[in-house]
From Swiss-Prot:
UniProt superkingdom: Bacteria
Subunit structure: Interacts with C.elegans aspartic protease asp-1; the interaction prevents Cry6Aa proteolysis by host gut proteases.
Protein's name in the database: Pesticidal crystal protein Cry6Aa
GO cellular component: extracellular region; host cell plasma membrane; membrane
Assigned protein family: Belongs to the cry6A endotoxin family.
GO biological process: one example: killing of cells of another organism
Biological role stated in the UniProt entry: Pore-forming toxin with nematicidal activity. In infected C.elegans, induces an increase in intracellular Ca(2+) resulting in necrosis of host intestinal cells. Also, induces the expression of aspartic protease asp-1.
């Protein structure tokens, strides 16, 4: 799953570990390093390209001919059929990534963005977050020492709000755990039909070794041609040196890259060297007849070597990904435990001025940290969607202002966006400035909306949170 033999995924960690605000209580911990979120845009685009290449691998002879642009008159030896089975497994893995891992990773980023904006608020719509409301409820508890009813209500609201955040943190912890499990399946396979990258890697290397021996640079056929041309060159050089008045030209054109795919062109007019003319003609015939085979071998084995390099990269960086999502799982567990401790804070501790001030400061600092992480998570999600389907296209957003609860909508239900959105509304990202008249949306179980003809990217708004987000674009 690689673009070409010169393009490989960077060897450094696939997923960046994180150092911003890691000491903030109630904060996001190590979820970002300040300028990279989970996976950088460039790495995500590269992974997407690898996966798309994997989806297009040839699994029969006709597909192989199309893939490497071989005409029907060029024969393909039967031993190349070894590729089809291993490519089929690689293709299955790529399909599994798209169906299972890709949505989970996007969902994990959405979880972080959703939680971050929930606790920190969203300045773009002047919406207060849960931490600001917790601060207000703490003020009500401290400032209403003589009003038992007001204190009781503030405590009830405070604990209920903490309970919501604890519940979501546990859900997101479980989601990160599921990603770790899925990554392990992707890399090592399962008991069903997913073979696993490491097993594909092993089989691919075996096929690569066999085909390189039969058709690569060290194959007997290529060695024989190389030796003949080498001997011919020596003979020509010796003859030319002996005949100072000989006007000749020997041109070697290395057209086939790493293999000996050159053609010898000889201009011989002097009778002194006519005795080697037959040798030259014979070598030329052999080279001409072998050219198609050499071209075939270069293309197919070059593709094989490139994909083998890609598999190596995916496996090593997949292992790094497991470590990071294990860490993310631990971060969510810590966040849940910290807020659980906050929920069980005693009334006496809250009413103590020093303790109350300390909690207020901690919530304020954590809110600032969450806002940064939430914005980065949202940006990452948009980049991930755009690079997975169409790279380098601008994201324009159109939103409906209707309150629609159906799963299918037509273009006439859309108007200029509003800032106060309600549940069951939609936001659409695409490269056009208007929707076609016959536009129709359909929603799948992952809350992803598809329009196959135009490849629209859809973002779902529900329960006061965006499933995805972007800057508004007024149509």
């Amino acid at each position: 799953m690689i673009i070409d033999s010169k393009t490989t995924l960077p060897r450094h960690s696939l997923i960046h570990t994180i150092k911003l605000n890691s000491n903030k209580k109630y904060g996001p911990g190590d979820m970002t390093n300040g300028n990279q979120f989970i996976i950088s845009k460039q790495e995500w685009a590269t992974i997407g390209a690898y996966i798309q290449t994997g989806l297009g691998l040839p699994v029969n002879e006709q597909q192989l001919r199309t893939h490497v642009n071989l005409s029907q008159d060029i024969s393909i030896p039967s031993d190349f059929s070894q590729l089809y089975d291993v490519y089929c497994s690689d293709k299955t893995s790529a399909e599994w990534w798209n169906k299972n891992l890709y949505p989970l990773i996007i969902k994990s980023a959405n979880d972080i963005a959703s939680y971050g904006f929930k606790v920190a608020g969203d300045p773009s719509i002047k919406k207060d977050g849960y931490f600001k409301k917790l601060q207000d409820e703490l003020d009500n508890i401290v400032d209403n020492n003589s009003d038992d009813d007001a204190i009781a209500k503030a405590i009830k609201d405070f604990k209920a709000r903490c309970g919501i955040l604890i519940k979501e943190a546990k859900q997101y912890e479980e989601a990160a755990k599921n990603i770790v499990t899925s990554l392990d399946q992707f890399l090592h396979g399962d008991q069903k039909k997913l073979e696993g990258v490491i097993n594909i890697q092993k089989r691919l290397k075996e096929v690569q070794t066999a085909l390189n021996q039969a058709h690569g640079e060290s194959s007997p056929a290529h060695k024989e041609l190389l030796e003949k041309v080498k001997n011919l060159k020596t003979t020509l050089e010796r003859t030319i040196k002996a005949e100072q008045d000989l006007e000749k030209k020997v041109e070697y054109s290395f057209l086939l890259g790493p293999l000996l795919g050159f053609v010898v062109y000889e201009i011989l007019e002097n009778t002194a060297v006519q005795h080697i003319k037959n040798q030259i003609d014979e070598i030329k015939k052999q080279l001409d007849s072998a050219q198609h085979d050499l071209d075939r071998d270069v293309k197919i084995i070059g593709m094989l070597n490139s994909i083998n390099t890609d598999i190596d990269n995916l496996y090593s960086q997949g292992q790094e990904a497991i470590k990071v999502f294990q860490k993310l799982q631990g971060i969510w567990a810590t966040i849940g435990a910290q807020i659980e401790n906050l929920r069980t804070t005693s009334l006496q501790e809250v009413q103590d001025s020093d303790d109350a001030d300390e909690i207020q400061i901690e919530l304020e600092d954590a809110s600032d940290a969450w806002l940064v992480v939430a914005q980065e998570a949202r940006d990452f999600t948009l980049n991930a969607y755009s690079t997975n389907s169409r790279q380098n296209l601008p994201i324009n957003v159109i939103s409906d202002s209707c309150n629609c609860s159906t799963t299918n909508m037509t273009s006439n239900q859309y108007s200029n966006p509003t800032t106060n959105m309600t549940s069951n509304q939609y936001m659409i990202s695409h490269e056009y400035t208007s929707l076609p008249n016959n536009f129709m949306l359909s929603r799948n179980s992952n809350l992803e909306y598809k329009c196959p003809e135009n490849n629209f990217m859809i973002y779902w708004y529900n329960n006061s949170d965006w499933y995805n987000n972007s800057d508004w674009y007024n149509n």
